[in-house]
Amino acid sequence: MFTRRFLAVLALGASLVFTAACGNGGNTAKEKTDITFFGSSTLAPVVTKAGTAFTEQYGKWNKADSSLPDADIVINVTSGGSGAGIKALLDGTADFGLVAREVKSSEKEKIKNYQEYKVGIDALTIAVNPNNPIAKIKDTLTSDQIKKIFSGEYKTWNEVDPSLPSTEIVVVTRDLGGGAHEVFQEKIMGDTKVTDKAIQAPSMGALVAKIIENENAVGYASYGVAKQNEGKIFALKVDGVAATPETIVDGSYKIQRPLLIVGSGELTKVQKAFMDYLRSDAGQKLIEAMGFIPVK
């Protein structure tokens, strides 16, 4: 954890600094002036960067809005996966869950006065190391080929294309609690399971790092994180469609996903101030600069 005026925790599975009040809009004798976010390893760095920018600009809440308390801005962000973000919200250990997938109906039903704030759009790219020979002879894979690679039916690269070497395919995925895993399972795998030989990365950054360090690796990399590592990984088209802002937004690129902040109850004044910043032109430009697609 680092401490200035902005506090952020990005250790996977780390405990939160404090216990959040139940619900976002509960009335207390003294208004709560810190905000806690927990969840998606894709979205957590975005909220962290936005929190840093917001804090550096204002420092205290009343500098952002004169009606807010004269108190330091304190924002806590912890990365632990989308499912863990929902759980933290339900447990009351976070004010907001960070979710990089659609929230399930069963999850919404458990959250009192469910609130959802869409701050960006992402996609999953099928990424390989640029030194992988497939990057030189193919620029696209079919959904069926991707399924066979990730299920382990294709074990060596020459099974994908006979001109490729007979080296072992190294499959890299997010851990099962990550939003990316659920999106990939729904959009590509269906009822077919990912091979149990897959390397499960604890974060999207770790997944991309595995692809960068192993030329035989393949994984589903966040579009935003892939953009941050441009030149270090090679993104294949899916069914002939490249992942671009246009194809992701219009749905022609099939493995897209929302970036959501999920809460319970009405926003407090300080929460609204930061949420408004995230969805302002400045906040959306920051999200775009990190490689993701803004919602406005």
Predicted regions and their residues:
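Bacterial N-terminal signal peptides that target proteins for export
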Residues: 1-10
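Exported/periplasmic ABC-transporter solute-binding proteins
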Residues: 22-110, 114-296
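C-terminal motif of bacterial Sec signal peptides marking the signal peptidase cleavage site
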Residues: 17-21
